[in-house]
């Protein structure tokens, strides 16, 4: 059976793993998922991730979750643009999460990036998810 929202599935695995205090979670690999994880890592929401290759054309991303004083660094993580309803924004209307304490991750013509990077580069795009 095919998955209709692979990115949403990855975000749900991260959310569930953090609520169960798992040290790491795994998800099937894709370029988009890896780019989103790059942003989460650079912004300090995860420790890191690694690609596990099974050799038959299948690979998996192992995501190391981050905790501070026993609590997950990620309080909320959710999908904004969904397969049935895509959300596109211009640079002027990029949403702020928790008055700038969280981030919005966008897919832009210049790549996947956080909201503050998109504002600096003056590009809009599809709002993938928000993290706080």
UniProtKB/Swiss-Prot annotation:
Asked if the keyword Ribonucleoprotein belongs to this entry, the reply reads: yes
Gene3D superfamilies xref list: 3.30.1370.30, 3.30.1490.10
One of the GO BP terms on file: translation
User: What UniProt keywords apply to this chain's record, in alphabetical order?
Assistant: Ribonucleoprotein, Ribosomal protein, RNA-binding, rRNA-binding
Could you state a single Gene Ontology molecular function term?
rRNA binding
Give me the Gene Ontology terms describing cellular component: ribonucleoprotein complex; ribosome
SUPFAM superfamilies in UniProt? Ribosomal protein S8
- Report if keyword DNA damage is assigned: no
Task: Specify the domain of life of the species encoding this protein.
Answer: Bacteria
Q: Assembly and interactions?
A: Part of the 30S ribosomal subunit. Contacts proteins S5 and S12.
Say which family it is in: Belongs to the universal ribosomal protein uS8 family.
Per the entry, what this protein does is: One of the primary rRNA binding proteins, it binds directly to 16S rRNA central domain where it helps coordinate assembly of the platform of the 30S subunit.
Report the PANTHER family cross-referenced here: 40S RIBOSOMAL PROTEIN S15A
Q: What is this protein called?
A: Small ribosomal subunit protein uS8
Q: From which organism does this entry originate?
A: Rhizobium leguminosarum bv. trifolii (strain WSM2304)
Q: What is the primary gene name for this protein?
A: rpsH
């Amino acid at each position: 059976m095919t998955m209709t929202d692979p990115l949403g599935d990855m975000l749900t695995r991260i959310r569930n793993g953090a609520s169960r205090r798992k040290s790491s979670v795994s998800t099937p690999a894709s370029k988009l998922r890896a780019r989103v994880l790059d942003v989460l890592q650079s912004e300090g929401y995860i420790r890191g991730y690694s690609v596990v290759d099974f050799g038959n054309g299948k690979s998996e991303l192992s995501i190391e979750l981050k905790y501070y004083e026993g609590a997950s660094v990620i309080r909320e993580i959710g999908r904004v643009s969904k397969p049935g309803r895509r959300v596109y924004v211009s640079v002027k209307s990029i949403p702020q999460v928790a008055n700038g304490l969280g981030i919005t991750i966008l897919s832009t013509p210049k790549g996947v990036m956080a909201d503050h990077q998109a504002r600096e580069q003056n590009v809009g795009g599809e709002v993938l998810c928000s993290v706080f």
